Amino acid sequence: MLDLVKELGVTCVRYPGGNFVSNYNWEDGIGPRENRPVRRDLAWHCTETNEMGIDDFYRWSQKAGTEIMLAVNMGTRGLKAALDELEYVNGAPGTAWADQRVANGIEEPMDIKMWCIGNEMDGPWQVGHMSPEEYASAVDKVAHAMKLAESGLELVACGSSGAYMPTFGTWEKTVLTKAYENLDFVSCHAYYFDRGHKTRAAASMQDFLASSEDMTKFIATVSDAADQAREANNGTKDIA
């Protein structure tokens, strides 16, 4: 895996990824592996052993030469858990969570700057699913507090789960307008793959290759929402 990541030139990897994060307790993945609890994973209806945690992923990223984008659980948790996690990861020794990191074998702060606040919270399949207004209020509070705790963070709001969502575009405009001052990026979630029409292999590949046109429209819609949010706030910065 490490060799493949290096060969591909991957520069940044999100952790934890996907729907999993909305029911994830980051504290479960630190300390000795034999002491870590096994939990139910509500996203994929299985059990999570927590054999891989923040410390382990940080060490892996050091070997892989990649930066980390840490994802915050906005499904079952929120503000307090995010601040504790930030302290554990980036805090200088001398506070409870930072000292716990040192005790777990990582003396220096990890200095992780990019944080994704939630994952696909517009999706009804997501644990803690929210309306645009609910997520806008929640992400604004979490992002504001995180930037009070540490300057220089780059915070990412979760955008729509796809262009097929009924609130696509409206979601981005609502969220970015409310939390404009505290956000830096919005994520674009779009998945393209060869759908494998057995009797239409050539057509299937053509559809797949044409997906770049759909992605261009997707980005344009999100960019337009970001521009409207900037104008509504009389702002000068661009949300990417």
Language-model features: where?
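Non-catalytic accessory regions flanking glycosidase/transglycosidase catalytic cores in CAZymes
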Residues: 1-171, 176-185, 212-240
